[in-house]
Curated annotation (Swiss-Prot):
The keyword Transcription applies. Residues 261-270, 1213-1251, 1348-1357, 1542-1551 have a biased composition (Polar residues). It holds the Pfam family ARID. It comes from Caenorhabditis elegans. It is found in: Nucleus. Residues 1165-1185, 1377-1392, 1474-1486, 1531-1541 have a biased composition (Low complexity). Residues 150-270, 284-307, 763-935, 1095-1563, 1628-1648 are annotated as: Disordered. GO terms for cellular component: nucleus; transcription repressor complex. Residues 166-193, 219-228, 251-260, 848-860, 1102-1112, 1145-1154 have a biased composition (Acidic residues). Keywords: Nucleus, Transcription, Transcription regulation. GO terms for molecular function: DNA binding; transcription cis-regulatory region binding. This is AT-rich interactive domain-containing protein arid-1.
């Protein structure tokens, strides 16, 4: 309509369109938008269409004058037309809301609501009151006729109305109304009979109007005004009150009507005037009452609205106040954090000032009136004295560029920033600006995908190859056709022309990245094809090389030209074209730093915390114990102090120590041309580098830190308020502390390297260490367990091999120790957990495939353990962070009985002490809820090489987290297809381009998309199974290794190269971020070689494999228990467990061997361990018995064939066929598993090859008693047996003498070592004769005695034979007929004892303990020539100096006598083979021997200096023995390389050594060292540092040994010179005295 407004206001009642019908509604919200057409009244005149915003103060009506903005000025105009484009948000009566246009709304005006009353009068709300439809006449007559009819009816029946009842009154009124209507309607042709029913219906409808009209209006108004449920409730209450008021008013009106009708004095003329007057009065009263009710309603609504607004304002103020308080709190915390960080930065600046400089120094400004805070400035020295800094300029230069590149906290460059030029710095800044956006980094990363480190080369790709050929033909006109390399060498100036410029401006082209691969045509044509990546769509395109146009040919275009070319591209390609143009142009012009592009793409940009950070920053440093009582800030939450109990010493270290650490760290990085921020932050919280370094140092080296994966624990201690700070903390450690910790852990300091690398304490004589207590308790626990049948299920049995449901016995201490070892595993790797985790595992019959550590619910049964066991804590920690002794790993498997045994008293442990303690069993954890996940299991991302089988453990990715899962079905097997693709790729593979071809990548991607694995979540949703892609799965390292090796078993598996497998692995694991170290192609090549060689190792079977299986079957009839433990292990894991353990190997070699189920042998304490029922333990169990801390190998073993023997043993090396390895009857020899009958071969066999030998085993034996020690023969028997052997040897010198077959007792006692076995091979025999092996290091504790049994002259030497034996508490290496079985002493060299002369009486000896340490016997060198000749025929014992035969005889006689003084015939038989007498060489005399508890590196440490005797011995050569203290009072010595001596004088030895050294260079080959250059060339790169470290230690020991030997030689030389001088002086004195006596006698003789 013309009178409608331009737009509708809020609250306007309209008729809105809803589902095709118009319903009543009210406008609630308006989004105004008017389109106005105006005519300008001023220049430039005309008409224009503007928006309502352009008419700021206009009244939007037609023909209204206003001002419009045109060309930044106001012009007078007139509105011509208005078009409403607004959006109206309306609310209908029933509460529905909708947004409509103006065309869907209609105002409530006269056109639609003119007959308001008639519409309401229609009987639509009461259908029961009418039976026929309403006629049109009643609607047309209007309201006036209705009112007249009512007045007529009421006037004609005025007095009689009150006398009739309601029904009669209604009937009469209807009748009268019908009559009056008939009189009034003169035009109606109907009869009176026909009109009466019609009038009655009309009267009934009119009467219904009065009752329903008000109710309908109130309902409609209330529903339209009710916007919420609360308003509807208020409307109901108002409606109720109105109904009550209307009823009261209605009653009053009726009374008034009656009174007015009754008291009316006006004459009634047809009843019309009184009725009209009454109706007007009634109408006025009704109107007044309605107005009154309306006012009352408005007042109530206003009152309620005020209350609502007041409540809303109160709530709004409360929220605003809370928001302001929160902002103030955050601002306070933010300022505090910034102030603390700023203070730490200033502190770091002062810490960096640690070097001297000549030019620069730093100072703080004192301009307090300008700045409130001091600032550090850099100044240049003029006097060039007392300078402080060199690194400040470096620091400022680096911070400037890093700040520009936003790299101050999370990136580190290897560049020397102080040498960076301005152009280089700006190139870095330009590179960072270009790659600042995440979208740009993604695009550039996709363009460079597939390129390793090559220089990027760009080309131009045309939409049609004809366009490219046209421009190439134009440029190469008049010349020969060039190759692509020749085109790239053409300068731009040579081709610059308008034609070239217009070509690139008009044609369709796009930049592309060129790949270096070159492919020949499959059809056999001469052309070559290249691979390019389209920088618009990112696809790989294979094009002819002749059609490539170098990007350098593009001319320099202006900004307008570039914009025009960009506009020609499709809309979705414009942004990429612009970025590609910019990137390629800047890169070609060297405006970008090519070295930092990939670094920036690999960075994780971490945004600094803003003021809107919701996480409250908490100081990093934990509160110290002495500040616990102080008041803390309410804004700073105090972390849990239990997390810092173990690190209290690190937290509370003084500031001087931290400053010293920071200074050394900065100096270290400065030496490596790098600068660090000594106060790094994570999410606004500072990280204490000293704290992090100490935590990592306690764990071990960097490899152990990465393998332990304790970043979450470190983050809780360092930054407890930060969330998900593990990766950032790992980055900080890698950038700041990794190299520094590696240097300090491996090489350490020179003074530290001179100290013995052991964790043992110095044990004084009589002192008893904790490790001895523990070993004694362990052996006592074995002794107290009685032997039972293998198949019995007795609960008291420990380690029975035949029981199915045996239980493991553990204690609370072992549980705590196991938890600690999870965090600090020794020599752990990322591929497999350490051996300490599998040495003592728990069986779970229902989950046999999962071998885990001690379950969590084991702690619930601590009340079952003894009080002492639960109260005791493991306090013996490793003192050397880089290594861990074997004892600390063996301690993890200590049984409960050993822990529960009462601690013995200090001193030597008793032999036959037994403690009976009931063995406690911890209940199994079946049905106790979910077990804790084994955190040591390593997972890697699955790729196309993975082969997922049913039951494998997986990790599934859902949302933003990895969950535990299991494979319930085998994944799609595409092994053959993958194999074909890899073999096809090998045809194009070249060593110069180690990368996959694009076709192989596409084929492998297709295969990867086909592979699906059906998994079952165990950590997120356990109700459903799901088919998942390999990209969202992780598999274990062991399963991935098996999957790689399965390609070797295919028919063409031998053709597959490890390089191809490594390339595929690297391509699909390029984005693997789970590993701590960066993965290179060499890493993947190494694991590929291991995987492919794994199947070959399976094919190489051991010689005694069948016997091993037979032995195991006989000894373990029921192997279900062992299968329950190893059931979940793969074949590769079982093979890893069966690796041969080299005796004397390093820790790393030993830890790689996984131990099997350790079966503890039951030992009878009354009988020797000769029963056949005892189970044979694996080699790992035998080595596990080395519980002494001195058993830890110092260096990794060197192959014996590479190490020649000592130079003294090289000359006249005797035949090795006569030496037996059978050992003694008391101590069995070492041999293979199940091959006990092959013990008669000699020890130094030429065919012994340990590299192909199987696993070595040692049987576990019980405690040794005097009943088990064979009795030593008498000296006469010794001499007789020796003479017998010498005569036999002289008779058959060429033939080898074999010992008698071993007895049954010796078979069951000890199995031979690999070094004592032999194979028959002549070539190996000659090789061993050329380069005989040196002694294998026996890592045991106790006396190490070498028997030299030979018939050669005294200037020759034979091999040294060593036998290993077990005893309570430690292992020792002893020999046949040795009296020092249970004693400890230094290294002793002894030869066959000579028969003592019968005429020489033995000097008296003091009483000596049978099992005590060997005492040193004073020796003399003043012998007669006849005695020396006899010594050459029958050599005597050599102890550094020559000793008398009588002394040796007496010593042998005493030592070879048992406690009861008798010798058994079996002992005499054994002594016939090798009979020796021994004496000891003190540490100071030979400086060698086994390193023992408390000993030093070079011959042992002496806590008390030996006192020299008060008087000199009669024998001059006895001074050496007098200078030394008795070995009983000395501490053990360390193990060093011994220097054998000869049984001759010092001069003879000196002359022989001079003859040997003549004409020979002093190089490594003469020092018995292998060719180190050759070892370095053959060794992998990652092992070079370890080999150099080992060589350093070896050279140090050689130097120390030589120095010690030289000192001993000099001392002996001085002693002999002194003795010679004294002898000469005595002879001279005697001769002079004789001469004087002769002269005196001559003088006194009387003359005849």
């Amino acid at each position: 309509m013309s009178d409608d407004p331009a737009f509708l206001a809020l609250g306007t009642e309209v008729s809105a369109k809803f589902k095709g019908a118009y319903c009543e509604a009210k406008i609630q919200k308006v989004d105004r938008s008017l389109k106005v057409k105006v005519s300008l009244k001023e220049s430039p005149f005309g008409q224009m269409i503007v928006q309502d915003n352009d008419l700021p103060n206009a009244k939007f009506e037609i023909n209204e004058l206003t001002d419009v903005v045109f060309q930044r000025k106001f012009i007078r105009c007139q509105i011509q037309s208005i078009k409403d484009q607004s959006k109206y948000h309306v609310v209908f009566n029933d509460g529905d809301e909708k947004e409509l246009r103006r065309t869907q709304l209609v105002l409530k005006g006269g056109k639609h609501f003119a007959a308001d009353g008639n519409l309401d009068s229609m009987p639509l709300t009461n259908p029961e009151s009418f039976s026929t439809p309403v006629i049109r006449g009643a609607a047309k007559r209007g309201a006036q006729k209705i009112r007249n009819a009512i007045s007529e009816a009421s006037g004609s029946r005025g007095g009689a109305v009150l006398l009739h009842n309601d029904d009669d009154e209604n009937d009469e009124e209807d009748q009268e109304d019908g009559e009056n209507e008939e009189d009034a309607d003169d035009d109606d042709d109907d009869t009176e009979e026909q009109q009466q029913p019609r009038e009655r219906r009309r009267a009934a409808a009119i009467s219904a109007i009065g009752v329903l009209k008000k109710a309908i209006e109130d309902t409609q108004s209330e529903e339209s005004s009710a916007d919420s449920s609360e308003e509807r409730e208020r409307a109901r209450s108002r409606r109720k009150r109105k109904d009550e008021a209307s009823s009261a008013v209605t009653s009053d009106e009726e009374d008034q009507e009656d009174l007015a009708t009754t008291d009316s004095e006006n004459p009634v003329i047809n009843g019309a005037s009184s009725a009209a007057a009454l109706s007007k009065t009634l109408q006025r009263k009704l109107e007044k009452q309605a107005m009154k009710r309306e006012k009352q309603r408005l007042k109530e609504e206003e009152r309620e609205e005020k209350l609502r607004l007041k409540e809303e304002n109160r709530e709004k103020k409360r929220r605003e106040k809370a928001r302001i308080m929160e902002l103030k709190r955050l601002e306070k915390v933010y300022r505090t954090s910034n102030a603390r960080i700023q203070e730490n930065h200033e502190k770091s600046m002062t810490q960096i000032i640690s070097h001297r400089s000549v030019r620069y120094f730093a100072r703080f400004s004192d301009l307090k009136h300008r700045r409130k805070k001091k600032k550090l400035y850099l100044h240049e020295h003029r006097q060039k004295v007392n300078s402080r800094i060199r690194n400040v300029k470096l620091y400022f230069a680096w911070r400037f560029v890093a700040h520009k590149a936003r790299l101050s906290y999370f990136a580190r460059y290897a560049l020397q920033w102080w040498r960076t030029s301005e152009d280089q710095a700006y190139s870095l800044i330009r590179t960072e600006k270009l790659l600042r956006s995440q979208r740009r980094r993604d695009w550039v990363g996709s363009w460079l995908e597939g390129l390793e480190r090559e220089k990027i080369r760009f080309v131009v790709i045309h939409e049609s190859y004809t366009q490219a050929r046209r421009i190439l033909k134009y440029i190469e006109r008049g010349t020969e056709k060039r190759t692509f390399a020749e085109r790239c060498d053409i300068e731009y100036e040579d081709i610059e022309s308008s034609t070239v410029s217009s070509h690139f401006r008009d044609q369709e082209w796009f930049p592309a990245v060129l790949f270096p691969q070159v492919f020949s045509d499959e059809n056999g044509s001469e052309g070559r094809q290249r691979i390019v990546r389209h920088m618009g769509n990112g696809q790989l395109v294979q094009v002819w090389e002749d059609d490539l146009v170098p990007f350098d040919w593009l001319p320099e275009y202006s900004f307008a030209d570039v914009t025009a070319m960009t506009e020609k591209k499709p809309v979705e390609m414009r942004r990429k074209f612009k970025l590609a143009w910019r990137f390629a142009t800047d890169y070609a012009q060297n405006r970008l730093d090519a070295r930092s592009i990939r670094s920036i793409l690999e960075w994780k940009f971490i945004r600094p915390s803003s003021r809107r950070l919701k996480i409250t920053p908490i100081p990093v440093q934990a509160p110290s114990p002495n500040r616990c009582g102080e008041d803390h800030d309410d804004l700073v939450s105090t972390p849990n102090e239990s997390d810092y109990d173990s690190d209290a010493t690190i937290k509370n270290v003084d500031a001087e120590t931290k400053d010293l650490f920071v200074a050394m760290l900065v100096q270290f990085h400065d030496a490596h041309n790098s600068v660090i921020d000594t106060n790094p932050t994570i999410q606004g919280h500072e990280v204490d580098l000293y704290y992090l370094y100490e935590l990592a140092k306690k764990t071990g080296g960097p490899k152990k830190v990465y393998a332990a994966n304790l970043w979450s624990d470190y983050a809780k201690k360092l930054v407890p308020a930060a969330t998900d700070a593990e990766e950032e903390l790992k980055t900080i450690f890698k950038n700041f502390l990794e190299s520094y910790l590696a240097i300090n852990t491996k090489l350490s300091w020179p003074m530290e390297s001179l100290q013995p690398r052991t964790e043992r304490k110095v044990v004084l004589p009589g002192q008893y260490s904790e490790s001895r207590k523990k070993r004694t308790q362990a052996i006592m626990s074995q002794v107290q367990t009685p032997p039972t049948a293998p198949g019995s299920s007795k609960k008291g049995r420990v380690g029975s091999g035949g029981t199915r449901g045996r239980k493991r016995k553990v204690s609370s201490e072992s549980v705590q120790l196991k938890k600690r070892n999870r965090k600090s595993s020794s020599r752990a790797t990322t591929a497999s957990p350490g051996p300490s985790e599998d040495r003592f595992s728990f069986q779970r019959p229902q989950d046999s495939d999962d071998v885990t550590d001690v379950p969590d619910d084991m702690t619930d049964h601590e009340d079952l353990l003894p009080e002492a066991a639960t109260r005791k804590k493991y306090e013996r920690k490793s003192q050397t962070p880089g290594r861990r002794s074997l004892s600390s790993r063996r301690d993890d498997t200590t049984p409960v009985s050993s822990m529960a045994a009462a601690p013995p008293k200090k001193g030597r442990p008793r032999k036959n002490t037994t403690v009976t303690t009931p063995v406690l069993s911890v209940p199994k954890s079946e049905g106790r809820g979910p077990r804790k996940e084994d955190t040591t299991t390593k997972f890697v991302r699955a790729n196309v090489l993975s082969h997922i089988l049913s039951g494998q453990k997986l990790r599934a990715f859902y949302g933003d987290e990895w969950f535990r899962a299991n494979a319930i079905e085998d994944a799609t097997d595409c092994t053959d297809e993958i194999m074909d693709i890899m073999l096809a790729h090998q045809d194009f593979f070249t060593p110069d381009t180690p990368r996959l071809s694009p076709s192989a990548i596409q084929d492998l991607d297709k295969v990867l998309k086909k592979i699906r694995a059906k998994t079952h979540y165990t950590g997120w949703n356990q109700r459903y199974d799901e088919f998942m892609k390999l990209e969202k799965l992780m598999v274990t390292v062991e399963d991935q290794m098996i999957a790689r090796g399965r390609f070797r078993h295919l028919p063409r598996g031998r053709e597959l190269k490890a390089e191809t497998l490594a390339l595929v692995e690297k391509h699909f694991r390029a984005d693997d971020e789970d590993d701590g170290v960066p993965k290179t192609l060499a890493f993947y090549l190494k694991i590929a070689q291991e995987a492919l060689s794994l199947s070959e190792k399976r094919a190489v079977a051991d010689d005694d494999e069948s016997s091993d299986s037979d032995t195991d079957f006989e000894q373990k009839p029921d192997t279900s228990a062992a299968a329950a433990v190893n059931g979940g292990k793969s074949e590769s894991e079982e093979e890893e467990e069966e690796k041969t353990v080299v005796m004397g190997g390093d820790e790393e070699a030993e830890e790689e061997v996984k131990s099997e189920d350790v079966l503890v042998e039951s030992v009878d304490q009354e009988s020797p361990p000769t029963t056949s029922q005892g189970t044979t333990t694996p080699e790992t169990a035998a080595t596990g018995g080395l519980e002494s801390e001195s058993d830890e190998p110092e260096y990794p073993p060197v192959p014996e064939e590479l190490v020649p023997p000592p130079p003294v043993l090289l000359e006249n090396f005797p035949s090795t066929d006569r030496f037996s390895s059978g050992g003694s009857s008391n101590y069995p020899t070492l041999s293979r598993q199940g091959s006990i009958n092959s013990m008669a071969s000699p020890m130094f066999s030429p065919n012994s090859d340990l590299s192909l030998s199987g696993p070595l085993t040692l049987p576990r034996s019980g405690p040794l008693t005097m009943a088990n020690i064979r009795q030593s023969p008498t000296p006469d028997e010794v001499v007789g047996s020796l003479r017998k052997r010498l005569s036999q040897t002289s008779e058959s010198s060429e033939s080898s003498e074999l010992p008698p077959p071993p007895s049954a007792a010796s078979k069951s006692k000890r199995i031979r070592r690999a070094s004592e076995r032999s194979i028959d091979s002549a070539s190996e025999h000659h090789r061993m004769m050329r380069s005989p092996r040196i002694l294998t290091t026996q890592h045991s504790s106790g006396a190490l005695i070498f028997d030299i049994s030979t018939t050669q002259p005294t200037d020759t030497s034979g091999p040294i034979e060593a036998l290993s034996v077990r005893k309570p508490g430690r292992r020792k290496t002893v020999f046949a007929a040795s009296p020092t079985l249970l004693t400890s002493g230094p290294l002793t060299l002894s030869s066959s004892a000579p028969p003592p002369p019968p005429a020489s009486p033995a000097p008296p000896q003091h009483a000596q303990k049978t099992l005590g340490r060997p005492r040193k016997t004073p020796s003399t060198s003043s012998r007669k020539p006849e005695e020396e000749d006899e010594a050459e025929q029958i050599p005597t014992t050599v102890v550094g100096v020559t000793e008398e035969a009588s002394v040796a005889d007496s010593s042998a006689k005493e030592d070879l006598t048992s406690e009861d003084g008798s010798a058994t015939p079996q002992d005499e038989k054994d002594d016939s083979e090798s009979t020796t007498t021994t004496d000891t060489i003190t540490p100071k005399s030979i400086r060698g021997g086994k390193r023992r508890r408390g000993g030093g590196r070079f011959g042992g440490s002496y806590p008390v200096k030996p006192a020299k005797p008060g008087r000199k011995p009669k024998d001059p050569h006895a001074e050496e023995g007098a200078d030394e203290k008795d070995p009983e009072d000395q501490t053990p010595t360390t193990m060093t390389t011994s220097t054998p001596t000869r049984a001759d004088s010092f001069q003879t030895q000196k002359n022989r050594m001079a003859k040997l050294m003549e004409g020979k260079p002093h190089d490594y080959s003469f020092l018995d060292l292998p060719d180190f250059d050759k070892i370095i060339e053959e060794a992998p790169k990652e092992d070079i540092n370890i080999l150099m470290e080992e060589r350093t230690y070896e050279l140090r020991e050689i130097f120390a040994q030589c120095k010690a030997d030289l000192s001993a030689l000099e001392k002996r030389y001085r002693q002999q010179n002194e003795a010679k001088r004294k002898a000469e002086f005595a002879a001279k004195t005697a001769s002079s005295a004789a001469a004087a006596q002769a002269s005196s006698s001559t003088c006194s003789t009387p003359r005849p």
